[in-house]
């Protein structure tokens, strides 16, 4: 309906009044283009069609470097390909890098997901596998941040032959929810705000309900994003990108809500299943030293996989968005991992 009104204004009043929810896929496309134009390496951006007619928005950097195993990066909740802008050039100097908007997020298709946690998770994982098949990628170094780390782990359980190394960056949804709240790290203000509305609506519904004030809410609750990307942008480009990614139809957001018990916890915690990943799949877990995520998970994964390669490390001066808080250190660590593969 909103898109129709934008394309075909009905009279002078419609053209005079601002659109209640000032967003569209074309606006998301435009702000993403401003971000991607910062790339120095050759890149290709396009839709990859899946057999079920869904489409996955995909960015491939350095497509000509085919001799090494490609790195595939999976963003977290509410994110998209643009948030990897501090990493894509550095991590594609010696190998091809692929990143994509998860099904239901960013510019990818936004279908209706199953409402149960297992069904929603499986829908995500199946879309990643059919994307891989459509891309013709035989195997990959798979990196996932936050929700992307949870889904990358689930994918590795089901398709271990396709994963040369699993890199989990501040992964969401691993530990069981403690019975004692005092054992939980204090989350940042924006997480508390999201958690306060979870019982009534989708996590980011407030952005859509706020209408023309939505973009301002992103800037108010996440001013840190502007600082993280200040070397590339001195305006509100990143805040606009985050807003337009999350002011659309909340398809992936609804699926995420089905998978979570509360914002910080999964209904199907990954620690209960990570032992199912084949023993020969190496895992590296990267945390921000100041993250609100439980960093003891790495040690617990080691205990569950005594006969497998598991490395966990913390990056000083970084919080949950490690890749943006300390991009140079993060890029060096990931590049070292990739070089260990080939």
From Swiss-Prot:
Catalyzed reactions: N-hexadecanoyl-1,2-di-(9Z-octadecenoyl)-sn-glycero-3-phosphoethanolamine + H2O = N-hexadecanoyl-1-(9Z-octadecenoyl)-sn-glycero-3-phosphoethanolamine + (9Z)-octadecenoate + H(+); an N-acyl-1,2-diacyl-sn-glycero-3-phosphoethanolamine + H2O = N,1-diacyl-sn-glycero-3-phosphoethanolamine + a fatty acid + H(+); N-hexadecanoyl-1-(9Z-octadecenoyl)-sn-glycero-3-phosphoethanolamine + H2O = N-hexadecanoyl-sn-glycero-3-phosphoethanolamine + (9Z)-octadecenoate + H(+); N-octadecanoyl-1-(9Z-octadecenoyl)-sn-glycero-3-phosphoethanolamine + H2O = N-octadecanoyl-sn-glycero-3-phospho-ethanolamine + (9Z)-octadecenoate + H(+)
Q: Which Pfam families match?
A: Abhydrolase_1 (PF00561)
- Return the broad EC class: hydrolase
Note the InterPro entries from the entry. AB_hydrolase_1, AB_hydrolase_fold
Q: Locate the AB hydrolase-1 domain: which residues?
A: 70-324
The reply to whether Lipid metabolism figures as a keyword in the UniProt entry is yes
Q: Does the keyword Hydrolase apply?
A: yes
Q: Which UniProt keywords apply?
A: Hydrolase, Lipid degradation, Lipid metabolism
Q: Name one GO biological process term.
A: phosphatidic acid biosynthetic process
- The EC number(s) given in the record are 3.1.1.-, 3.-.-.-
A single Gene Ontology CC annotation of this entry is:
mitochondrion
Q: What does this protein do?
A: Lysophospholipase selective for N-acyl phosphatidylethanolamine (NAPE). Contributes to the biosynthesis of N-acyl ethanolamines, including the endocannabinoid anandamide by hydrolyzing the sn-1 and sn-2 acyl chains from N-acyl phosphatidylethanolamine (NAPE) generating glycerophospho-N-acyl ethanolamine (GP-NAE), an intermediate for N-acyl ethanolamine biosynthesis. Hydrolyzes substrates bearing saturated, monounsaturated, polyunsaturated N-acyl chains.
Q: Which family does it belong to?
A: Belongs to the peptidase S33 family. ABHD4/ABHD5 subfamily.
Output this protein's name.
(Lyso)-N-acylphosphatidylethanolamine lipase
Which source organism does the UniProt entry give?
Bos taurus (Bovine)
